[in-house]
Amino acid sequence: MQIRLKPDYSFFIASSSTMASTSSLGPSTLLSYGSPSRQFPDFGFRLISGHESVRIPSFRRFRVHCESKEKEVKPSSPFLESSSFSGDAALRSSEWKAVPDIWRSSAEKYGDRVALVDPYHDPPLKLTYKQLEQEILDFAEGLRVLGVKADEKIALFADNSCRWLVSDQGIMATGAVNVVRGSRSSVEELLQIYRHSESVAIVVDNPEFFNRIAESFTSKASLRFLILLWGEKSSLVTQGMQIPVYSYAEIINQGQESRAKLSASNDTRSYRNQFIDSDDTAAIMYTSGTTGNPKGVMLTHRNLLHQIKHLSKYVPAQAGDKFLSMLPSWHAYERASEYFIFTCGVEQMYTSIRYLKDDLKRYQPNYIVSVPLVYETLYSGIQKQISASSAGRKFLALTLIKVSMAYMEMKRIYEGMCLTKEQKPPMYIVAFVDWLWARVIAALLWPLHMLAKKLIYKKIHSSIGISKAGISGGGSLPIHVDKFFEAIGVILQNGYGLTETSPVVCARTLSCNVLGSAGHPMHGTEFKIVDPETNNVLPPGSKGIIKVRGPQVMKGYYKNPSTTKQVLNESGWFNTGDTGWIAPHHSKGRSRHCGGVIVLEGRAKDTIVLSTGENVEPLEIEEAAMRSRVIEQIVVIGQDRRRLGAIIIPNKEEAQRVDPETSKETLKSLVYQELRKWTSECSFQVGPVLIVDDPFTIDNGLMTPTMKIRRDMVVAKYKEEIDQLYS
C-alpha cells in the first residue's frame, strides 16, 4: 500500500507499488479523497478502476494535510546578506533558501522578545531574538575572518547551550558544513567522526572536554584552529600543542570589528562572495553507535527547511509560548524542533534530566519536546506520588483515574478514533449501536471525570505545566502512558522519523490525535508498506517494512555510496528499517477517522527469531513490563533460543517498599511475579530472567543520546551471563 500527497489537494491510496496516471491504471484501483477546504469538510470520494469512475456519497472525516509541492529554487546569496547590511525587509518563509535565513525573519518579527534562556551555564544567559541574530552574524563573520570557506567541514562537539545554537547557525551561514556530536561520546568515536568527515577545525564545549580528547586529536588529526564556547583558555592543557585557540568572546569580537569596518565603508560585497544553494549540505550527522562503518547523514538546507516550514501543522506554537528543551541540540529531532519554534517567536529554556522536575514547575512550559522515556518517567513520578498518599486519597485518585480512562475510551469510540487493522468496515446498524452505546456510557462517566479534573488533575498540571502539548519522538510511546496522560488532560502528540529524514515524516495533529499511532504523513511525504521478502507493496492493515519518500529525505551517507544504495533507491524511496502498517479507511464505525495514519511495530532488526522459527517483537513485552514500578529497565532476549528471556534492572527502592526484607532471591522472585503479572496478555511469555545492578545509561554506552537502549551492546556485555542463563 502506498500513500501519496498530491499537489491538487487530493489524498491517494494506490494498490500498486508505483503510482500511475488514471488513464493508465489498468486493473489497479485508486481511491481519491479531495477538498481544498482547511476545515473538516464532507469528503466525497471517487472509485476509479481501469477507465471507469463512480461517484460515491460523501462522508464525514478529518482532513489529511495536502499542499502543492515546493518549487525548485535557484542559488541564493547567503544569510549574511541580511537587513542588517542591506536594509531589506524581513524575508518571507517562501524566500528562505538556507536555514540561517530564518533569523532575519524572526529578528524582524520578534526582535525584543526573549528567544533563549540558558540558566545553567556560567554566566547564565538570556537572549532576545535581535541579540541572537546579531551573535549569529558576528560568529559567522568571525569564522570568515579566520578563513573558513563554503563546503569546508567544521566539527561542533558540544552540548545544549545558547552558544551551541549560535555556532551551529554561524557555521551554516558561512556556507560551511557543521559536523555535530555531543561531549559524552567516546574519544575514539569523536576522532573517527572528525577524520572521516574531513573536518578542518573544531568547536568544543569547554576546556575540560578538550583536555579529555587533546592527546588523540593533536597527534592523529589535523586542526586548523580550536574554539572554546565556555571557560578560559588558561585551563587548557596546551603542552606541545601548536594550534591557534580562540574563546567564544574573541570570535564574536572579531566578527563585530569586521562587520563594523565593512558597514563604515558601505561595502557589503564581501558578504556576497559565496552562494548557498538549497541543495547544499548543511550538516553531517553521524548515526548513533558509529563503529567500523561510519554513517554520516548528509542533510541539506532544503531537507531542514521542509521541517521548519511544515511542523506548524502539528505544533501550532504562538509568539510567547514557552518550550522546555532537554534533548541534545545536535540530535536531528531536537535540532529540527528548535529551528522551527524560533520561527514562531517562542521562548525556549534549556534544562536537563537533573533539573527537569524543578524546571517544569518553575517555568510552567506550554510545550515540552522529548522522548518516550521522559514521559514514562513523569508517569512513574505521578504514580509514586499517588502511592505515597494516605489510603483514602490513594483509593480516590486511582479510582477516578480509571473512570477518566474509561471515559476517554468511550469518547474515542464515538469520535471514530480507535485503531483497527480490519479492512472491512462494520455494518451500518452495528456501527450505530456501537456509537450510541459509547455516547451513553461517556455521558454517565462525564460527571466523575469532571470531578477528577477538579480534585486531582489540577494539582498534577500545576506541578508539570505542559498546558498545550507534550511532543514525543525518537521512539515508540507506550500505549499505557499515552492513555494515562490523555485521561488526566495532558495532550501527547507522537511523531515518527529518523536522522536520515531530517527527521519527521509523520506526526499526530491536535485534530486527529489517534492514540497508538504516529499520525498522518507530513506535507509532500509518501509512505508505502512492503513485504520484507518480496518487496511487494502490501494493502492497508498489513504489517511490513516502512518506506518513505519526500523532500526531507537525506542526500545520502557521506563518502559511503554502497551503504546509501542499500537504503535509498534511485526513485528516492528510503528504507527505514522499521516495521509497521497503515490504518485502513472506513466510512463508518469507531475507526472512521483513523484512515491513513501510520502505526509502528518496531525495528526489523530487533525482531527475535526463536529456534522454533517463531518471530517475536520484543517491544510489546517490554512496554507491558515497564508498567510495573518494580522494573526499572528491561531488554527481552532469545535470538536462536527455544524461549524468550530478559535482562532486568530492578527498582530496588520500590521493591523494598513492597517487601522491606528483600534479599537477592526474594527480589528475583518479586521481579518475576511482576513480569508475569504485566505481560500475561502478551503473545509470548518470558522464561529465564537475568537481574543486573548497573543501569543502562548514556555514559556507559548502553543508551543512545535520545535514551533508547542499545540492545546489541547490552546483549554483548552480558553474553557470558546469558549463556549461563540458558544452560
UniProtKB/Swiss-Prot annotation:
Single annotated GO MF: long-chain fatty acid [acyl-carrier-protein] ligase activity
EC number: 6.2.1.20
Compartments, record wording: Plastid, Chloroplast
Keywords, sorted A to Z: Chloroplast, Fatty acid metabolism, Ligase, Lipid metabolism, Plastid, Transit peptide
Keyword ATP-binding in record: no
GO biological process: fatty acid biosynthetic process; fatty acid elongation
Pfam families: AMP-binding (PF00501), AMP-binding_C_3 (PF23562)
Family of the protein in this entry: Belongs to the ATP-dependent AMP-binding enzyme family.
Function: Probably involved in the activation of fatty acids to acyl-carrier-protein prior to fatty acid elongation in plastids. Acts on medium- to long-chain fatty acids.
Protein name: Long-chain-fatty-acid--[acyl-carrier-protein] ligase AEE15, chloroplastic
